[in-house]
Amino acid sequence: MVDKLTHLKQLEAESIHIIREVAAEFDNPVMLYSIGKDSAVMLHLARKAFFPGKLPFPVMHVDTQWKFQEMYRFRDKMVEEMGLELITHVNPEGVAQGINPFTHGSSKHTDIMKTQGLKQALDKHGFDAAFGGARRDEEKSRAKERVYSFRDSKHRWDPKNQRPELWNVYNGKVNKGESIRVFPLSNWTELDIWQYIYLEGIPIVPLYFAAEREVIEKNGTLIMIDDERILEHLSEEEKARIVKKKVRFRTLGCYPLTGAVESEAETLTDIIQEMLLTRTSERQGRVIDHDGAGSMEDKKRQGYF
């Protein structure tokens, strides 16, 4: 009986139902894999949904080439251990133009390497449904997004042209060229995610745990020195301000656009305790969310995750 399930078990059952529904309803679904904690939980739920069989769809990473090195190592390890069918896509036009977050800024870099890259990959493989790990508690534009988020033939999201979702009934009807973005974790919170990771023993990128790391403060955000490329874009005065601090990440993206937070949380229980006390959004460290008022909604209207 549903009323005997714990809060997390109810969320788990809802997410598994959504994942199975998509697998049964759509011709060519794909699971977007950004390597972060939400992707880890979503992938775990998908494997549970079809256990002991394999996933009936591939996972796809839209690579900007600016993720943390630990994220790439973790991705490759998980793919090998789980036997996943991984598709990686890098926007060739962005690479040819040398697009990067330093020279071109966060907005242009995100649009070309993430949004346009995603649209290219979806078109190339003809996917009609794409799972994403977004949650409604993350950000205000995501709070009004449906579980089945309808996208037109150009992958655009129109918040005024979405379908009603009553109880657990979802309308997946699409015409040729249209698609659905599916968010099985819509009703989860950041705390739910961490508690589930703890209870299920889900592996995550070590960057989520506090450790001594080299960082530089830029515009009030602690940016980690992840590889040599960032040094090419720092002045000598800025290089002199590089310090070691005990930090961790609440959210992961392109490393020059993702801020760390000072923390002592070295274990999952520490992180959960920290989440119980925090009053700030996990996305406060995402530079792309501060490009302008309504910037996330604008990005989603153009086809962003």
Curated annotation (Swiss-Prot):
InterPro entries: PAPS_reduct_dom, Rossmann-like_a/b/a_fold, SO4_adenylTrfase_ssu, Sulfate_adenylyltrnsfr_sub2. One of its GO terms (molecular function) is sulfate adenylyltransferase (ATP) activity. Pathway: Sulfur metabolism; hydrogen sulfide biosynthesis; sulfite from sulfate: step 1/3. It catalyses: sulfate + ATP + H(+) = adenosine 5'-phosphosulfate + diphosphate. The keyword ATP-binding applies. With CysN forms the ATP sulfurylase (ATPS) that catalyzes the adenylation of sulfate producing adenosine 5'-phosphosulfate (APS) and diphosphate, the first enzymatic step in sulfur assimilation pathway. APS synthesis involves the formation of a high-energy phosphoric-sulfuric acid anhydride bond driven by GTP hydrolysis by CysN coupled to ATP hydrolysis by CysD. Its EC number is 2.7.7.4. Belongs to the PAPS reductase family. CysD subfamily. It comes from Pseudomonas putida (strain W619). GO terms for biological process: hydrogen sulfide biosynthetic process; sulfate assimilation. Heterodimer composed of CysD, the smaller subunit, and CysN. NCBIfam families: CysD, PRK05253.1, PRK12563.1. This is Sulfate adenylyltransferase subunit 2. The keyword Nucleotidyltransferase applies. The gene is cysD. Keywords: ATP-binding, Nucleotide-binding, Nucleotidyltransferase, Transferase.
